[in-house]
Amino acid sequence: MAGKGSYVPPQYIPLYSLDTEEDRVPAVEENHATRPKLNQDPTQWSSGICACFDDPQSCCIGAICPCFLFGKNAQFLGSGTLAGSCTTHCMLWGLLTSLCCVFTGGLVLAVPGSAVACYACGYRSALRTKYNLPEAPCGDLTTHLFCHLCAICQEYREIRERTGSGSSPAPNVTPPPVQTMDEL
């Protein structure tokens, strides 16, 4: 076999890296310990946790029906359907609130919030990972535990801002002209 050392394998591109020049891995690495670093600086949230009134739409939906807003967030983050996440959130909240009211006479209403916060903080963590966002203002669980509705609204605003949904106008579609067949 002539040219035994002439084969160079194709360039490896990790799935998580960006397709920019500084993030590319060299075809042949001299030192395997030296790897290109991804952008470690987290980007900032597009709005604050208490910026609900900057976006009246998400504020109203989040206050009236947080289950729907949570379902939209979960649907975007890969849960599959809006109905499944929305229903799970609503049923979990309703069931736990009912149980707490029955067993404690309505005295312990913080337990449902903590159970739903445990469920919802996973989606916040997934959103932060997806967009490289800081764990702010507190940890994911703490944020959902004490500011659940505000956290859901913030996550919704972030998804809408990053994906551009809701900000672009609907396309103008015109039907084709009417065509008729004439007899010869």
UniProtKB/Swiss-Prot annotation:
Annotated segments matching region Disordered: 162-184
Tissue expression from the record: Expressed in roots, leaves, stalks, immature ears, endosperm and pollen.
Record-annotated disulphide pairs: none
Membrane topology reported for the UniProt record: Single-pass membrane protein
GO cellular component: membrane
Matching InterPro entries: PLAC_motif_containing
Localization (cell): Membrane
Membrane-spanning intervals of the chain: 91-111
Keywords tagged on the record: Membrane, Transmembrane, Transmembrane helix
Cited Pfam families: PLAC8 (PF04749)
Signal peptide: none
Family: Belongs to the cornifelin family.
Protein name: Cell number regulator 5
